[in-house]
Amino acid sequence: YEIMPSLVGSEMCIRDRGEVSRPIVSYSYDLENITPYSYSVYLDEADIQVEYAPSHQAGIYHISFGTEGDNALVVNTKNGKLVAEEKGVSGYQVIDNTPTKIYLYLETSQLPLRKGVLADGKVDMESKEGSAIALYYGSEKNLNLRYGISFISAEQAKKNLQRDITTYDVKAVADAGRRIWNKTLGKIVIEGGSEDEKEIFYTSLYRTYERMINLSEDGKYYSAFDGKIHEDGGVPFYTCLLYTSPSPRD
């Protein structure tokens, strides 16, 4: 998935990549800050600040538009279908060369003033289903959005969001993630060594916690081994299969 904030100017500043299903917004960026529990970046030419925090099967964004105008959000699935909802978007994306679908449910704190399907560099306001959905927010300069993902269904993605994130406060979600990581990495305290050596050690320790991944969703899980949904029997199902989370385009 691609989540792309844009200031509407000429055709939403969207350039086609030669494929209708792959629209992009051209960004340059600076002041990037990455931690295990947060991400922020300034899209300098667009004058847009993006803040992000992940949860288990959900994530949250705060987008600040620095320029007055008709601000918009484009959600794109490279290989799937999206539907414009009252406050956002739902749908699925197929992982390349597999039968596996990643489902998405995304909602914003503000109701979009209008919405439509982006295709051929233009937005069809009459259509509400397609590979790329454009949501318009007018002169609103601050946009909050949150999403859930699932390997089971868009409805389950919504449940995952409602379970993991109940706020539109990015800092609150990031702070919760920071506490979890501090508790986890703080189980081992090292003495001596240089700061560089400590960074290497804790970076390596952090990476050991990136795998395995719990794919259970309210007692069920999708297995890519047979393409079926199973009951987990009360035992979380772990695998090295990655979730693919929507993120700002670079």
Language-model-detected regions and their locations in the chain:
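Beta-sandwich/jelly-roll carbohydrate-recognition scaffolds of carbohydrate-active enzymes
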Residues: S6, S10-T239
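Single conserved hydrophobic/aromatic residue that forms the stacking wall/gate
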Residues: Y1-G9, I14, Y243-D250
